[in-house]
Design a protein with these regions (language model features):
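Generic beta-strand/beta-sheet core signal
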Residues: 268, 292, 312, 336-338, ...
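N-terminal donor/sugar-recognition subdomains of glycan-related enzymes
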Residues: 2-264, 271-288, 297-301, 308, ...
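Phosphate-binding loop/pocket of nucleotide- and phosphate-handling active sites
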Residues: 410-452
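Extended, hydrophobic alpha-helical segments in both membrane/secreted and soluble proteins
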Residues: 289-295, 335, 381-384, 400
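Glycine-rich phosphate/pyrophosphate-binding loops
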Residues: 136, 295-296, 303-313, 388-415
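Active-site/ligand-binding-proximal alpha/beta "capping" segment
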Residues: 343-399, 403
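Alpha-helix capping and helix-loop boundary segments enriched in small/acidic/polar residues
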Residues: 267, 283-286, 290, 310-312, ...
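Short secondary-structure boundary/capping segments
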Residues: 149-151, 305-308, 313, 325, ...
Length: 662
């Protein structure tokens, strides 16, 4: 599958397609049609695993017993004589009647252990199961099963997704869980062990389970939990549009400087930064220096010139980092700042070189692609890392990136303006020995770092954590900063980076008009959806309240089924209206914040049993009750965004009028 990284460019697939052709030609020589078909299908999911299975030699650890019944397949460990199943056919039948029936409404299910594959083949006859994720710890069992049971159709459609646990990483699980169906059904997550045979892999099971739990937590956190924060971002982004369009263009800068430097040093503000500053000053002329916003005052104090300063925060407090002018120290630096930054930050940075950038979220829908996209994750540290990647550095070095408290309790380097609130979470220490105290937010930053680093490691980029303290960041090479700088700058010339010009007047006018039209259409469509939701809410809310009152009295019965079904149909029509393609691009972001947590609860309700009429009645009562809050929340969110956008777009309207564009 093509993977989009942070510059919004799809990774080239030519080499992958060539490998697929070569692989298919080789695999097609396999006599066993079942194994051949399975490997070809698996290759589209996991090239490395498919190749490992193809090249696997003699099987030594297991024996296979096949009875008269085609599903009577058992696998026995030769050393321990433990059986995968006691009685394969009846065990699988019991699993289908038990877990299969219990979870028959689950769109997504997770299992540890592939077994003989028959259970999953049967389970996927239920079309409700959109995806079944299976993690198998033993390569030989994978090999045996894919030789015996044809799962090619299920693998090719990705209704069955197989991971080999030895190759499985947090980044892979995170990339899986950011998918829409996985994130919505996060609260239904349960990691089922296939059979007791797999109990001997308990440590591995726990490791993979932690990956899923971390990934789910990261995905939920990325949705945010505050409409107020979202509205502040909308307000700031809309107010900043004229400056974004008239200022330096992000893609122009990337094209001009891509591949010019080999090494980037990202400067964070952890307590370990103090000891690295002298080394950084010495080697700064030979590397790209990317300063986080909070690091700028510290670098200025020590006379270190940054090449880029990144910032992603929307609050006014961040603007204080840019208040002081640093003369020659930052006159040539480009301030790469998310467009949702506070307008005061824009004022404080100017007239220095400001590049406002769009994040790969709701801003994509405006079509101002030259100004994006940068800033996946919750931190400007993640933004800086993604910038270093997009600029095509071969080496990315982190310093001051403690993501943990120092032994003396300090959370930041000397000279940093803000302290970190107390929390008692612990993570593996730098060097892998012991633990250090961290925070929930820092842990989420670290998760994003590790996901990005795993992706770039595969592309041949070397990632160094030269913080020499704080938390371990998996995937990085831990080395002393001075040693890494000496190695990477040996024989390098002083850097001499070219600058870019402002966009021409024609482009500015075109994009201002484009932004204006988008904002007007957005307001119009949001008002249409809001009106529809309010109408339906006012119509169904009294009926829902009545049904809930009856339920709470214990008087809900089968006779209420038709009424609840009628309410549900009205709600469904409202959701279908809001989900129309023409509205979706304009309301998707406010939708994701306003009702995401209701959607998580609705997903839980949707998988509850409803085999009898009374079960259906109780389930529908829960369903309509949650949708009352859903309708109210989204209508309220839209109303707030409409008002915010109208007020914030005054700058843009003034600009287009001044230029005679409307």
């Amino acid at each position: 599958m093509a993977i989009k990284f942070h510059d919004g460019v799809v990774a080239p697939q030519e080499k992958s397609e060539e490998r697929a052709k070569e692989y298919a030609q080789t695999v097609n020589k396999i006599e066993n049609a079942v194994f051949r078909n399975n490997l070809n299908a698996l290759f589209s999911q996991d090239e490395i695993l498919a190749t490992r299975l193809f090249s696997l030699g003699e099987q030594k650890n297991y024996e296979v017993f096949i009875g008269k019944d085609p599903i009577d397949i058992n696998i026995i460990d030769k050393k321990t004589l433990s059986y995968l199943y006691e009685k394969p056919a009846s065990d699988i039948q019991n699993m289908l009647e038990g877990l299969g029936a219990e979870c028959k409404r689950y769109p997504v299910m997770f299992f540890y252990g592939l077994g003989n594959g028959v259970f999953y083949k049967a389970l996927l006859y239920n079309q409700t199961h959109q995806h079944i994720i299976v993690v198998e710890p033993d390569l030989e069992i994978l090999y045996i099963t894919l030789n015996l049971v044809d799962l090619s159709k299920e693998l090719l459609s990705e209704r069955l997704i197989i991971f080999y646990s030895e190759l499985t990483t947090y980044s892979q699980i995170y990339q899986l869980m950011i998918g829409q169906v996985y994130s919505v059904y996060a609260k239904t997550y349960n990691f089922h062990v296939h059979t007791p045979f797999y109990d001997k892999f308990a440590d591995d099971y726990n490791r993979i389970n932690q990956y899923f739990v971390r990934a789910i937590s990261q995905v939920v956190a990325s949705h945010g939990n505050s409409v107020d924060d979202l509205l502040q971002g909308v307000r700031n982004n809309t107010e900043n549009l004229p400056q974004l369009i008239k200022g330096y263009v992000y893609q122009d800068l990337i094209k001009k400087r891509k591949g010019l430097m080999d090494t980037a040093v990202i400067v964070a503000t952890g307590p370990s930064l103090d000891k690295q500053l002298d080394t950084l000053k010495k080697f700064a002329p030979y590397v790209t220096v990317i300063s986080l916003d909070a690091s700028l005052p510290i670098l200025a104090k020590h006379g270190i010139k940054p090449d880029y300063v990144t910032s992603i925060e929307r609050v006014i407090e961040t603007s204080s980092f840019f208040k002081k002018r640093n003369g020659n120290l930052d006159k040539d630096a480009y301030f790469i700042v998310a467009s949702l930054t506070h307008p005061q930050s824009v004022k404080n940075i100017l007239p220095r070189r400001l590049v406002l950038t769009l994040r790969p979220q709701a801003e994509c829908s405006m079509g101002l692609n030259k100004h994006g996209y940068l800033g996946i994750g919750l931190s400007t540290a993640n933004q800086a890392y993604q910038l270093a990647y997009v600029l095509d550095h071969k080496n990315i070095v982190l310093i001051g990136q403690d993501l943990a408290f120092a032994p003396d309790g300090k959370s930041h380097a000397t000279g940093h303006a803000f302290a970190q609130a107390d929390e008692n979470l612990y993570t593996t220490a730098y060097g892998g020995i012991g633990e250090v105290r961290t925070t929930y937010v820092w842990d989420k930053f670290k998760n994003q770092y590790e996901s990005d680093i795993e992706s770039t490691n595969k592309k041949g980029i070397k990632n160094y954590n030269c913080t020499e303290g704080g938390a371990m960041i998996k995937g990085t090479i831990e080395k002393p900063f001075v040693q890494v700088m000496e190695e990477l700058t040996r024989g390098k010339e002083l850097k001499n980076l070219p600058h870019i010009s402002f966009p021409n007047e024609k482009t500015i006018k075109k994009e201002l008009l484009q932004a204006y039209k988008f904002i007007q259409t957005k307001i119009k469509f949001e008002e249409e959806v809001k009106q529809k939701l309010e109408e339906v809410f006012l119509e169904v809310a009294p009926d829902i309240d009545k049904m809930i009152e009856i339920r709470d009295k214990g008087e809900l019965s089968e006779k209420h089924f038709k009424k609840l079904l009628s309410i549900t149909k009205k709600i469904d029509k409202a959701k279908e209206f809001a989900g129309r393609q023409k509205y979706r691009r304009y309301i998707e972001y406010i939708l994701s914040i306003s009702v995401y947590y209701q959607e998580l609860e609705l997903a839980k309700i949707s998988v509850e049993p409803s085999d009898t009429t009374i079960q259906k009645v109780n389930k529908l009562a829960e369903w309509v009750e949650m949708h009352k809050y859903w309708l109210f929340s989204l209508a309220g969110g839209l109303d707030a965004e409409i008002k915010t956008t109208k007020k914030a777009s005054k700058n843009l309207i003034k600009e287009v009028k001044k230029l005679g564009l409307i």
